[in-house]
C-alpha cells in the first residue's frame, strides 16, 4: 500500500470541485485503487504525461475532470485535479 501525499494545490482543487458540484466519491474510488497499486479500468484513460508534467500520470475521472498524480517507490503524490482548462 502506498503512502498518500496531497499537495496544497490538490487540496484547493478538491474544494473547487466540491463547489462545482462534482461527485467526490468518484475521485475517492480512483484514489483507493491507486493506493493499493491496482490498475485503473480503461474507462479512466490513465496515461503518462509529457512536457512540463514528465514523470506524472493523468486519468479522467469524467471526460473533463482530470487527476494528475505521481507514483514513487513507497508513496503516491496527488498533485492536481480539475478541468483541462484549469490544469493546462
Enumerate the language-model features and the residues they cover.
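Basic, Lys/Arg-enriched alpha-helical interface segments
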Residues: 1-58, 63, 71-77, 85-88
